């Protein structure tokens, strides 16, 4: 629409003409988050922003799309104070009259947002906060983790004395490396009876290759004269994002996937990164590498309480998504109650026998 509206009381300006180049250039420095970069929006998410909400004091750049009555703020895994999120939502509701809800990814407790909301999904982003240097990072790990890492590395080097890792800008090899990575990932998931999102989204490999070409690097481990593991890493400001890792099935006994991620973190520490994002999922082994969870909750933010009635289908989907976890908790509680009852019965029988 080629228009911008300024709301001085909110310290906000809403542009309805896409993401301007100047605003896009600010994203990396503002958030140091791969998931809040123009490259991520264009490739991994495959969306073009319809506009951007710009805040002052403090500065924020929040690209968004509009789909009917829904505004989607595209930023992910980024820091914003609840009060600033409120300012942005108020400005967007004013600028987009037909909007009844705004989808917003919050890394603060959702209850601190003083607007009507619905919680859709919560994920834990696993992040390693790095001390200064590789040795300090290694020393920060638990004793058993350090012992296991030495065990796995020694096992790998005994079997493959030539093992080494090269950090490269993929260039023309990008698609080749992505295809090899995907083949390893698919083979491993098949053994587990699972399907990868690479199979569910056939164009994912092409989009990921473009993201890699724009801003990524490949950590390629070779052993026995062949490539054995690949990690794709993206540096944004002082943050490193270890987005994907896969390895050849023959190296399972060496725990090469675990080692590859450990080496990525060590490399980031050596290069002076402040933190490494190991993204979401598999929190147990990522925790062994020093990662701690940072919850992110996808919210529907409403203009007013009555707007909820226009999205009851969304409420049903959110409830359904939560249902399996509720069922699991119920079953766990039921089993615990059964064990308690059985234990009480055994004690009662024992007491009766003594009388």
Outline where the language-model segments fall.
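A conserved beta-strand-loop-helix scaffold within acyl/acetyltransferase catalytic domains
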Residues: 2-69, 107-125, 135, 139-252
């Amino acid at each position: 629409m080629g228009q911008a509206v300024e709301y001085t009381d909110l310290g906000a300006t809403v542009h309805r003409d896409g993401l301007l180049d100047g605003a896009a250039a600010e994203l990396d420095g503002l958030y140091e988050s791969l998931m809040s970069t123009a490259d991520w929006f264009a490739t991994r998410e495959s969306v073009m922003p319809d506009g951007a909400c710009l805040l002052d004091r403090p500065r924020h750049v929040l690209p968004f799309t509009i789909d009917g009555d829904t505004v989607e703020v595209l930023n992910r895994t980024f820091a914003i104070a609840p009060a600033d999120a409120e300012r942005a939502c108020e400005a967007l509701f004013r600028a987009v009259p037909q909007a009844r809800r705004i989808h917003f990814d919050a890394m603060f407790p959702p209850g601190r947002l003083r607007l009507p909301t619905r919680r859709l999904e919560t994920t834990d982003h696993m992040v390693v906060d790095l001390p200064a240097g590789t040795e300090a990072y290694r020393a920060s790990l638990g004793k058993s983790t350090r012992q296991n890492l030495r065990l796995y590395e020694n096992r790998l080097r005994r079997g493959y004395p030539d093992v080494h890792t090269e950090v490269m800008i993929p260039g023309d090899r990008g698609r080749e490396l992505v295809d090899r990575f995907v083949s390893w990932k698919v083979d491993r998931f098949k053994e587990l009876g699972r399907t990868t999102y690479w199979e569910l989204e056939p164009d994912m490999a092409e989009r990921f290759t473009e993201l890699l070409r724009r801003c990524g690097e490949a950590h390629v481990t070779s052993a026995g004269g062949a490539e054995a593991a690949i990690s794709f890493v993206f540096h944004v400001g002082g943050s490193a994002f270890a987005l994907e890792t896969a390895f050849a099935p023959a190296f399972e006994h060496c725990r090469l996937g675990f080692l590859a991620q450990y080496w990525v973190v060590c490399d980031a520490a050596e290069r002076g990164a402040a933190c490494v994002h190991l993204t979401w999922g598999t929190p147990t082994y990522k925790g062994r590498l020093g990662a701690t969870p940072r919850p992110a909750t996808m919210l529907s933010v409403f203009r007013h309480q009555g707007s909820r009635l226009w999205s009851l289908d969304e409420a049903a989907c959110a409830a359904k998504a939560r249902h399996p976890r509720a069922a699991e908790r119920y079953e766990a509680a039921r089993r615990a109650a059964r064990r308690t009852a059985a234990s009480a019965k055994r004690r009662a029988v024992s007491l009766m026998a003594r009388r």
